[in-house]
Amino acid sequence: MQLRITSRKKFTVLLCALGLISIVAIYPRQTVNFFYSTAIQIKDYIHFYGYRPVKSFAIRIPASYTIHGIDVSRWQERIDWQRVAKMRDNGIRLQFAFIKATEGEKLVDPYFSRNWQLSRENGLLRGAYHYFSPSVSASVQARLFLQTVDFSQGDFPAVLDVEERGKLSAKELRKRVSQWLKMVEKRTGKKPIIYSGAVFYHTNLAGYFNEYPWWVAHYYQRRPDNDGMAWRFWQHSDRGQVDGINGPVDFNVFNGTVEELQGFVDGIKETP
């Protein structure tokens, strides 16, 4: 039975080979064009994503960037930061982490203090973010954030996560966002980073706050649709896997050099 199957397979392969040779002989130009086109499509597909498939991280990593990081919140629960910092694959390691601190007027992420301390202790650059609630006073939200986060030299500037406008007009939303940014900048001495999705940015924020660094979320794209935004960070996936973290985690890249990255963490005022 085994010999019969093997012979049948060989015969099938021979027929396919003869058929391919016949096609090439009859339609040489068309065949060459087909294979060339297919090769280009494969190349473009690979280039479309960047493209470095990294098995351990379970995602494709944009290949044009060398500085990689994650962002986390209570949804990742208890993180083993030592394992996160030690993870390496295909020349890629995680160098920074943005950590959720607060939301709205009252919510403090239950894992923030632990994440804030251990990420730094294990050698990652760290940043803290506030999820902006459009229905709550911007000044109240800024005070909550500043009371929660103890900035130290070497930390990223504060981050404001703007993803919804509720019942506000885009103009009113921008006014409240501006209030938060100015309060936090005055206290920390550094312009905060603004995080938003590409679509929300285009609809509500494009053309404003150009003096601030941007962190854009746009998944599974060759590059983010930035609509003229001079972005510094790109959240390119929400499906990454990292040692020491249960479940999926957001992945980000920094758009710049190591020296430029250092500029982000220089000069922030320490806060109690």
Swiss-Prot record:
Keywords: Glycosidase, Hydrolase. GO terms for molecular function: lysozyme activity. Disulfide bonds: none annotated. The active site is at 71, 163. PROSITE patterns: GLYCOSYL_HYDROL_F25_1, GLYCOSYL_HYDROL_F25_2. InterPro entries: Glyco_hydro_25, Glyco_hydro_25_AS, Glyco_hydro_fam25_subgr, Glycoside_hydrolase_SF. One of its GO terms (biological process) is carbohydrate catabolic process. Belongs to the glycosyl hydrolase 25 family. PANTHER family: LYSOZYME (PTHR34135:SF2). This is Uncharacterized protein YegX. The gene is yegX.
